[in-house]
Regions:
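Thr-Gly-centered strand-to-loop micro-motif
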Residues: 6-8, 15, 42, 105-106, ...
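Conserved C-terminal alpha-helix-loop-beta "cap" of PLP-dependent enzymes
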Residues: 103-155
Length: 185
């Protein structure tokens, strides 16, 4: 691995902290970053020590719980996929060997934002894509060759260790009910 970036909130650390790893052999080929006027433009401002400690603690705790967390999320992923496969009109966009934390599927007939709003009223929260592509069609789905309708009706589910089988049941019930209620709009 040459580079790795980590957003703290993705590993249950404080929002606003992150880490960047760059292999020495790669770092030597890069131009140094510039950060305004601090430290001759080579360093950012004052580090947020509590957040740095929080990221370290979250990383250590995450490492200790990694295997059971992966198994738990894999079980939730299988439960969701099995439930979605039973619903007419649903297309699973995530391949079987995709990362376990994310499942992407399309309804094929109901705009993503309409379905997101419907699920929100049931306290079920999903997205229409990744945060970095908010409001834009999914570049990933387009690159996979998905049809425009598939992309416009896609929903993205993200799992974490705090999710439960009951959460998946609530999501599946919401999708099932939403398919019935929203097709007539």
């Amino acid at each position: 691995m040459d580079t790795l970036s980590v957003s703290g909130h993705k590993v249950h650390a404080p929002k606003g902290i992150g880490a960047l790893f760059i292999r020495d052999s790669v770092r030597q080929t890069l131009c140094p970053p510039t950060w305004r006027h601090q430290e001759r433009g080579l360093r950012p401002g004052t580090e947020n020590t509590p957040y740095i400690v929080g990221l370290g603690v979250a990383a250590a705790q995450g490492q200790q719980k990694l295997r059971p967390r992966i198994a738990h999320i894999a079980a939730l992923n299988r439960q969701l996929r099995a439930g979605l496969e039973e619903l007419d009109g649903i297309t699973l966009n995530s391949p079987d060997d995709a990362v376990g934390e994310i499942v992407n599927f399309s309804t094929g007939c109901i705009n993503s934002q309409t379905f997101i709003n419907y699920l929100n009223t049931r306290a079920v929260y999903v997205s229409g894509g990744s945060a970095c592509d908010k409001g834009e069609p999914s570049h990933t789905l387009l690159a996979m060759g998905c049809a425009d309708l598939t992309v416009r009706t896609a929903l993205r589910v993200s799992f974490c260790a705090d999710n439960t089988a009951e959460d998946v049941d609530a999501l599946l019930a919401g999708v099932r009910d939403g398919l019935k209620e929203l097709q007539h709009i």
